[in-house]
Curated annotation (Swiss-Prot):
Its main location: cytoplasm. The keyword Ligase applies. Substrate binds at S87, H88, N89, H90, R109, Q238, E310, S311, Q312, S532. The gene is purL. Monomer. Part of the FGAM synthase complex composed of 1 PurL, 1 PurQ and 2 PurS subunits. Pathway: Purine metabolism; IMP biosynthesis via de novo pathway; 5-amino-1-(5-phospho-D-ribosyl)imidazole from N(2)-formyl-N(1)-(5-phospho-D-ribosyl)glycinamide: step 1/2. This is Phosphoribosylformylglycinamidine synthase subunit PurL.
Amino acid sequence: MDKATIKAHKINEQEYEEILKILGREPNLLELGIFSAMWSEHCSYKSSKKYLNGFPTKAPWVIQGPGENAGVIDVGGGVAAVFKMESHNHPSFIEPFQGAATGVGGILRDVFTMGARVVANMNSLRFGEVCGDSENARKQRYLLKGAVAGIGHYGNCMGIPTVGGETTFDASFNGNILVNAFALGLVKSDEIFYGKAEGIGNPVIYVGSKTGRDGLGGAVMASDSFSDANKSLRPTVQVGDPFAEKLLMEACLELFKKDYIVGIQDMGAAGLTSSSFEMAGRSGSGMKMQLDRVPMREEGMSPYELMLSESQERMLICAKKGCEQKVLEIFKKWDLDAEVIGEVTDSGQMQLYWHGELVGQIPIKPLSEAAPVLDRPTARPKYLDEIKNLQIPKDIDNKTAFLKLLRESEILNKALIYDQYDANIQTNTIKQPGYLGAAVIRIKETGKALAMAAQCDPRANFVGPKIGAARAVAAAGRKVAMSGAMPLAITDCLNYGNPQNPEVMWQFAQGCEGIKEACRELNTPVVSGNVSLYNDTDGVSVYPTPAIVSVGVNDDARANLKSVFGSAGTAIYLLGETKGEFAASLYVKALFDVVGGTLSEIDYKKERALWELVIAANKAGVLEFANSVGVGGVAMSLAKMACISGIGAECKFDVAQANFIFDESFSRALVGVTSEAKFSELAAKFGVKFEKIGVTGGDKFRLNEIDENLKEISEIYFNEFANIIKQED
């Protein structure tokens, strides 16, 4: 094998030597391509696995933790929730519509392959600077429009509601946008399917769309940095067909009602290669496949192309022997391709045939369960010492600061984005996008509700990689709790830069430690997730972005707690302590273009007590609304609540310094109290500090010296984002 071919497959010298040992010979091109895909960062997690192993993954309600297509938790009444989040960052930067659309398609397959009907989508999106007339700003607006359109197109065509998410902007994402997709499905607790291929002689069946050449090398592409030399990568981006996926989902759900199969696996990154190796690897078995039987969309396709294509809307099934015809009939009924292409063996080898000739043979274990694990060097970034002491350069009056922060893209209403998503299809949505806090859907079969919230502050993770990641877990859980639901588990999508940079690996290692700590202390285990590395262009990495989605259960769907004002005359209480913390805050970034400071540690007892107080007070019927205090502090949280509800507020907030109304002290919430005596008793019981700061009502927004007309600030809040993004329209 010549060095140029090996290099083109991103295989280094050490890895190639290992391949020679495993095979006892030189690999052919097909085998080299398979090693390249399965040992890529995207498939093998070789740089990250060392740090993921310590994640808390168990609890009485966890049915399936990491290692399967998606995580599963028991949500009561014989129902389980199946959920996961994944990235499609690199494809979305190259071709935003198809990249984002197929990201949605892939995460949907991960969920419904477990036997669940998908009932909710969410997303976590990061773009660069969108304001202004620079070439970069125009490109970022183009990327945003394309990615959002792709997400909406796929989810809407599938008939699955997109119920929430988060979108933020920062210059660190100018060279790499982040598109993280989340999906959640429901299944009976005793009807879950797994991705395994066992039982000697059991048939292996290919189902779904035909295989084409789209997406070739996608897993390897997603395991590399961008540079000027590799930006013509459109052929590596998959092309999605949501209508084909809808048929595939319905066919699979029909199949799951029968007793015909042993296991099923989505063909995602690395296509037929990853699905076959993963299924056999989990079961410790072998597999034979006749590649000439794979349904092909294009003429003249080679075994290499068939194994590594990432054409969408495809699954691999291990059926029970004798049930082949029944499986095929179901998929033919739904007008999908279905062919028996192989069988399970006890060889521990993947044997690949082409018109009867053996064209590839590789041991399965070294490419699945025993793939290489790297121990990359780490180094604490030098910049941390340079930014740790935050100095606010000068005083700015609060009215000026308020109007400046209100116009920030992070704060502005994102109706331009979420209006492209159908949030109400399936008629289960209780709280949809645009109303702050967690998204909430009902479980019709049980009368319960599921709350889910996406959260991550990249600036905080840049300033303090460990505490920032822990805060993402805690803040996502707090949003869920503010709806009245108890947070039960999380899924993560860990977006970092180039792992070959020791400072990036240090950020990643610290982020994992923060997640471990927060999940352990808050009793919200990790049940699924994804790692996306190489979010780096020309040596510049994105801010560390460990995106978290927390999922919780409210035993009574009718007792969902609003996040915005519900009526005039309700007392507004602030829960938690305001300490004047501006590290990584929007205040210093927006006003002074500074990102720095030192984050304070999380007091997990106080965080958990805040959750439990709000949940208990909601059950007691003494709350009208609850909203987590986040970016922009009390001032921005209150302003958004007023604008969305159309109800003003009269607030007086005792602070040590005037600008503390914008501080981002952690573990705080704003609640509307309908019985002050009863609420005071509960707050004392849970040991949560509280302060009455005002009352809802009127057509003004007043907070200390800020005195604004509600209609005027609402026009800014609701219209300014569209004005920014639609400049070229």
